[in-house]
């Protein structure tokens, strides 16, 4: 009989306007009869008859005459009227005034106002099952729940970022459709209005819901899927409710401690009394009423720090309620406890979200009746690829900006020729660029995509850069003082206890954006860099530093000898020898501590003699984690130039701290003078590298992994004409998009291979003459394969693509995989399975299914790539010996 509104129990309690939760069961549809007659009249001209529906109208034997049809309508009305009176009498008998909307029936006769065409007949339908007892049962249940919870209804609804309910939600809810008026009551209208108001408040609040029902209600009423997924991912990376609370409380206490310690040490300590040595106790050096003597500049400094503290506390309080909702989402809907959250993989979480969406499609779509069509599509698209695009909508643009060197001219310091990017500058870039081109919902503004508004937008962005530069002039003094204190307190004790940390290295902020892949979530990227740090340090340390080692060994010998003498004299001398002053004001204890620290630093900085100098092997091993090995480095891995370029990416941590502090001073110059010059290039970048996807909105072109786009194809050869130059412009540098695609496949596992009968795009590309080199280059960069042929190198790795079809094995023989297992640590077993089968998982979504039929490639002849045999290097020699043994056997 058509698509009728399927009510749930909660929709019968709160009203159909809310329609909050999942469908209870198939029998619930029996009670959705408020629009029965309208639907009946709307569909009675349709033919042929449809299959029986759970909602049925009782009718007698089918008759083709108009008289019999009218009698059937009268019978239907009598049954409905009798049922209505039964419900009304039961509720009145129990002193319950309001009839739920889902139980309301039409008062008019079904044939009144009907425009049914003469000669048509009503489709037959089976008899209606008895529903009287069920109505009584649900009526009592609704009344019982309402009576038990009216006294405990919360006065306010928890507001959150993801699940924000409108403040006037209760006033927008429609009144109950039917209220029984007591004829004997004097104030009948007043009592009816009071009942209407109570029911409106009852439906507008969530106090009636259990934690599970509330979680389902919020899941079905998500209005901003980007923000919701960011909250879900933030809860995952924060390791659960307790860890997030402790972390944020700790951050607040650190700010409080720094503010208090700074104010106390700067104003409440008499340093003259302390340094003279006359003070013997704490009260002798404390200044009375010290805070009343604070200068105006100090008051401004503490006022800024106090404002930061207040903003952090406000942000913490606003997110506190959201954390509870996300906790219920994980614990109740996904079935993941906070303890398990610290060990479960993100791909498993994505799979659970996808299963939850599939099991609750109706509730998810019907939860918010005001959603647009695009919003409905967005809630249907929850594959791993779609979720990654939502979480990294802005980050993908940032990765592409550094990949295409859009900001390179502005961030290059004159006379230094070095990219200058720090965390503080990065924060200002996001504030000036991304907060300008994206709206409050996290979507790209339509004006950015209009070429006619290019100059106006560029002018506005130029003003934002200069305004930020002016503001940074006033904020720089306070920020410099704060960060000096913060870094001093953070690193001093670590360096004192472990002086070798002075020589520790870390990837710079510029390197992090340069090395990051498209759609690579932060925790996956951090894991990849952590695995590369040890090997990267080995690569740098193996370079000979003979002159430096000689100096360090000399200083270590002198300081170690002096410390040894002082320690021996301390043991043999009297008990006050440590207080003996070797120089004026400097005791033996001071020199033992100072010289001991110098000895430890020098000794830890001396290169070890047991390292083997093989920079190419080391750097290629690092490249399987960093996925970064420029063509310009080929054949020059042993040179100081390549080492210095790599050191700019993997710099000393102490230098990075100094650059962070220096950037606060240079920030006004970069923001006001350098960055405004690239405003037009930034606007052009967002317009030319954005693509709209139904259900996702505008995303970065490279993040969609589209390899077959005609207007923006992937190129592997140098540009020779204007068309090639244009295509080169629209292509990601360093084959980053292909590498990102392959790493994305590796990261999200190979569960549930999809049997679609369609060939993946990468597999099709691999058979094209111009594309095979591209994929091979990308995989060599992602693994331990040799990227350059013909270049002089000390180590050559045997794995090569022997077939144009990636469906065949990457390695020519299975024995080669076992032999070279230690050199392919960056490739998991799942990755090798991908490269052998290269089918796409249902977890990855439809973005990876591009539409050509699978072709039989088993009989394809080998092309020019078959001659890429690897015969050079030590490992190549081992491979040849291994093949020789096979021939002998």
Curated annotation (Swiss-Prot):
Membrane topology according to the record: Multi-pass membrane protein
Membrane side Cytoplasmic: residue ranges: 1-248, 321-395, 397-468, 571-651, 673-889
Catalyses which reaction(s): a 1,2-diacyl-sn-glycero-3-phosphocholine(in) = a 1,2-diacyl-sn-glycero-3-phosphocholine(out); a 1,2-diacyl-sn-glycero-3-phospho-L-serine(in) = a 1,2-diacyl-sn-glycero-3-phospho-L-serine(out); a 1,2-diacyl-sn-glycero-3-phosphoethanolamine(in) = a 1,2-diacyl-sn-glycero-3-phosphoethanolamine(out); a 1,2-diacyl-sn-glycero-3-phospho-(1D-myo-inositol-3-phosphate)(in) = a 1,2-diacyl-sn-glycero-3-phospho-(1D-myo-inositol-3-phosphate)(out)
Pfam family, one: ATG9
One of the protein's GO biological processes: autophagy of mitochondrion
Lumenal side: 270-299, 490-549
Keyword annotations of the record: Autophagy, Cytoplasmic vesicle, Endoplasmic reticulum, Golgi apparatus, Lipid transport, Membrane, Phosphoprotein, Transmembrane, Transmembrane helix, Transport
Record's comment on post-translational modification: Phosphorylated by ATG1. ATG1 phosphorylation is required for preautophagosome elongation.
Function: Phospholipid scramblase involved in autophagy and cytoplasm to vacuole transport (Cvt) vesicle formation. Cycles between the preautophagosomal structure/phagophore assembly site (PAS) and the cytoplasmic vesicle pool and supplies membrane for the growing autophagosome. Lipid scramblase activity plays a key role in preautophagosomal structure/phagophore assembly by distributing the phospholipids that arrive through ATG2 from the cytoplasmic to the luminal leaflet of the bilayer, thereby driving autophagosomal membrane expansion. Required for mitophagy.
Comment on protein domains: Forms a homotrimer with a solvated central pore, which is connected laterally to the cytosol through the cavity within each protomer. Acts as a lipid scramblase that uses its central pore to function: the central pore opens laterally to accommodate lipid headgroups, thereby enabling lipid flipping and redistribution of lipids added to the outer leaflet of ATG9-containing vesicles, thereby enabling growth into autophagosomes.
Similarity annotation: Belongs to the ATG9 family.
Complexes and interactors: Homotrimer; forms a homotrimer with a central pore that forms a path between the two membrane leaflets.
Protein name: Autophagy-related protein 9
Gene: ATG9
């Amino acid at each position: 009989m058509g698509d009728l509104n399927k009510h749930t129990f909660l929709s019968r309690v709160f009203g159909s306007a809310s329609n909050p939760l999942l469908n209870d069961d198939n029998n619930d549809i029996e009670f959705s009869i408020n629009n029965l007659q309208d639907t009946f009249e709307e569909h009675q001209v349709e033919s042929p008859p449809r299959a029986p529906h759970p909602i049925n109208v009782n009718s007698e034997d089918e008759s083709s005459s108009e008289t019999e049809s009218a009698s059937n309508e009268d019978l239907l009305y009598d049954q409905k009227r009798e049922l209505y009176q039964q419900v009304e009498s039961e509720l009145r008998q129990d002193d319950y005034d309001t009839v739920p909307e889902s139980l309301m029936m039409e008062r008019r006769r079904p044939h009144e106002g009907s425009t049914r065409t003469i000669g048509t007949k009503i489709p037959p339908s089976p008899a209606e099952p008895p529903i009287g007892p069920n109505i009584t049962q649900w009526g009592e249940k609704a009344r019982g729940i309402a009576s038990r919870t009216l006294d405990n209804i919360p006065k306010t609804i928890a507001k959150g970022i993801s699940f924000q309910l409108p403040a006037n939600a209760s006033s927008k809810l429609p009144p109950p459709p039917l209220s029984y008026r007591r004829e004997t009551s004097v104030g009948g209208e007043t009592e009816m209005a009071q009942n209407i108001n109570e029911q409106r408040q009852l439906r507008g609040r969530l106090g009636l819901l259990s934690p599970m029902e509330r979680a389902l209600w919020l899941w079905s009423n998500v209005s901003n899927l980007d923000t919701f997924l960011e909250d879900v991912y933030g809860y995952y990376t924060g390791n659960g409710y307790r860890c997030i609370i402790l972390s944020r409380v700790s951050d607040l206490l650190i700010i409080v401690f720094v503010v208090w310690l700074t104010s106390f040490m700067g104003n409440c300590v008499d340093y003259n009394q302390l340094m003279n040595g006359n003070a013997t106790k704490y009260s002798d050096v404390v200044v009375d009423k010290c805070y009343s003597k604070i200068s105006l500049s100090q008051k401004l400094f503490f006022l800024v720090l106090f404002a930061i503290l207040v903003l952090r506390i406000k942000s913490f309080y606003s997110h506190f309620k959201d954390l509870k909702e996300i906790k219920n989402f994980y614990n109740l809907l996904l079935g993941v406890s906070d303890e398990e959250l610290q060990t479960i993989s993100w791909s498993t979480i994505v799979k659970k979200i996808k299963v939850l969406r599939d099991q609750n499609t109706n509730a998810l779509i019907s939860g918010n009746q005001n959603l647009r069509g695009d919003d409905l599509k967005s809630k249907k698209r929850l594959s791993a690829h779609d979720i990654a695009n939502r979480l990294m909508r802005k980050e993908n643009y940032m990765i592409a900006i550094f990949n295409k060197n859009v900001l390179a001219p502005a961030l290059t310091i004159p006379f230094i020729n070095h990219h200058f990017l720090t965390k503080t500058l990065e924060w200002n870039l996001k504030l000036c660029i991304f907060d300008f081109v994206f709206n409050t919902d996290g979507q790209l503004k339509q004006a950015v995509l209009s070429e006619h508004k290019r100059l106006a937008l560029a002018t506005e962005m130029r003003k934002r850069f200069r305004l930020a530069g002016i503001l940074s002039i006033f904020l720089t003094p306070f920020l410099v003082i704060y960060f000096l204190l913060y870094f001093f307190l953070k690193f001093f004790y670590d360096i004192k206890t472990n002086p070798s940390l002075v020589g520790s290295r870390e990837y710079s902020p510029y390197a992090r954006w340069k090395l990051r892949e498209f759609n690579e979530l932060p925790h996956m990227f951090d894991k990849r860099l952590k695995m590369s740090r040890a090997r990267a340090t080995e690569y740098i340390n193996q370079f000979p530093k003979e002159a430096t080692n000689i100096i360090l060994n000399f200083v270590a010998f002198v300081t170690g000898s002096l410390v040894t003498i002082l320690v021996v004299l301390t043991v043999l001398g009297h008990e006050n020898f440590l207080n003996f002053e070797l120089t004026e004001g400097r005791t033996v204890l001071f020199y033992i501590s100072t010289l001991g620290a110098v000895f430890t630093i020098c000794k830890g900085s001396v290169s070890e003699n047991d390292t083997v100098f093989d920079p190419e092997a080391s750097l290629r091993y690092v490249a399987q984690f960093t996925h970064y090995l420029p063509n310009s480095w080929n054949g020059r891995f042993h040179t100081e130039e390549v080492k210095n370029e790599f050191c700019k990416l993997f710099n000393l941590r102490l230098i990075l701290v100094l650059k962070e502090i220096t950037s606060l001073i240079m920030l006004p110059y970069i923001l006001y003078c350098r960055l405004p010059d690239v405003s037009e290039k930034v606007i052009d970048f967002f317009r030319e590298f954005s693509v709209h996807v139904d259900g996702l909105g505008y995303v970065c072109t490279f993040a969609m992994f589209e390899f077959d786009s005609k207007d923006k194809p992937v190129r592997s050869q140098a540009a020779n004409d204007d068309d090639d130059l244009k295509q080169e412009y629209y292509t990601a540098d360093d084959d980053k998009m292909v590498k990102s695609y392959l790493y994305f496949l590796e990261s999200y596992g190979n569960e549930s291979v999809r049997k679609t009968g369609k060939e993946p795009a990468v597999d099709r590309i691999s058979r094209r003459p111009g594309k095979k080199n591209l994929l091979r280059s990308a995989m060599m960069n992602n693994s331990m394969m040799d990227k350059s042929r013909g270049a002089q190198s000390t180590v050559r790795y045997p794995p090569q693509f022997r077939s144009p079809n990636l469906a065949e094995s990457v390695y020519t023989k299975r024995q080669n995989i076992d032999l070279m297992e230690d050199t392919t640590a960056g490739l998991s077993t799942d990755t090798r399975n991908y490269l052998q089968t290269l089918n796409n998982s249902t977890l990855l979504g439809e973005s990876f299914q591009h539409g050509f039929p699978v072709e039989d490639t088993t009989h394809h002849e080998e092309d020019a790539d078959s001659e890429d045999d690897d015969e050079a290097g030590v490992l190549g020699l081992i491979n040849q010996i291994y093949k020789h043994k096979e021939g002998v056997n």
